[in-house]
UniProtKB/Swiss-Prot annotation:
SMART domains given in the database record: EFh (SM00054)
Presence of keyword Calcium: yes
Job of this protein: Potential calcium sensor.
Keywords carried by this UniProt record: Calcium, Metal-binding, Repeat
Gene3D superfamilies given in the database record: EF-hand
Protein's name according to its UniProt entry: Probable calcium-binding protein CML15
Pfam families (UniProt xref): EF-hand_7
């Protein structure tokens, strides 16, 4: 779910440099605003391994509710609202305009993959994106992700997640044994590519 964290981390940035870094990090705020140079950099980047491609496609399918191979404005808004993030029609229109590089009014898998790729060498942006993604899961803002908070977000994006399953997922990354995920544990998990994308059985 590294990509989902990307999608939800850009809402409400007031300065253009924050918006220009792209739509990355949905998983979970909103303001994805790639510049053409960001899209070109993502396209020129070395190919991603199959696991990253599979993850990108899996997240894309979460957005593409009707399965037609493209994300519509309504699908984009519905997903964000389903995880409790109010987005205005203007925000959705801006996201669509900035992500839709071919101007057809939809986001294709290729456009989605291009805007999901982090810009090369931008460690500060990556850290900021992780903080925003963490904040989406940490609904009460107390600095840790609980099993219930994790289950809420996963259910919001269409994953059938119980609190018990989320406890097991947390156990896999909980280094201090408190049954919760703090930001440092979250960073390690995302860096390892574990994510929350696969529900424990």
């Amino acid at each position: 779910m590294g990509k989902v964290r990307a999608f939800f981390s850009r809402k409400g940035r007031g300065n253009s440099s924050g918006r220009s870094r792209s739509m990355r990090e949905a998983a979970m705020n909103v303001d994805w605003s790639p510049r053409p140079s960001d899209l070109a950099a993502a396209a020129a980047a070395k190919p991603r391994p199959p696991a990253a491609e599979d993850e990108t496609e899996r997240v894309f399918r979460k957005f593409d509710a009707n399965g037609d191979g493209r994300i519509s404005r309504a699908e984009l808004a519905a997903l964000f609202r389903s995880v409790g993030h109010a987005v205005t029609d203007d925000e959705v229109a801006r996201m669509m305009q900035e992500a839709d590089s071919d101007g057809d009014g939809y986001i294709s898998l290729g456009e989605f993959a291009a805007i999901s790729a982090p810009p090369p060498g931008d460690a500060a942006a990556a850290e900021e994106d992780l903080r925003h993604a963490f904040g989406v899961f940490d609904a009460d803002g107390n600095g840790v992700i609980t099993p219930a908070e994790l289950a809420r977000v996963l259910r919001g994006i269409g994953e059938a997640a119980t609190v018990a399953q989320c406890r097991r997922m947390i156990d896999g990354v909980d280094r201090n044994g408190d049954g919760l995920i703090n930001f440092e544990e979250f960073k390690l998990m995302m860096a390892a590519g574990a994510g929350f994308g696969r529900i424990a059985s």
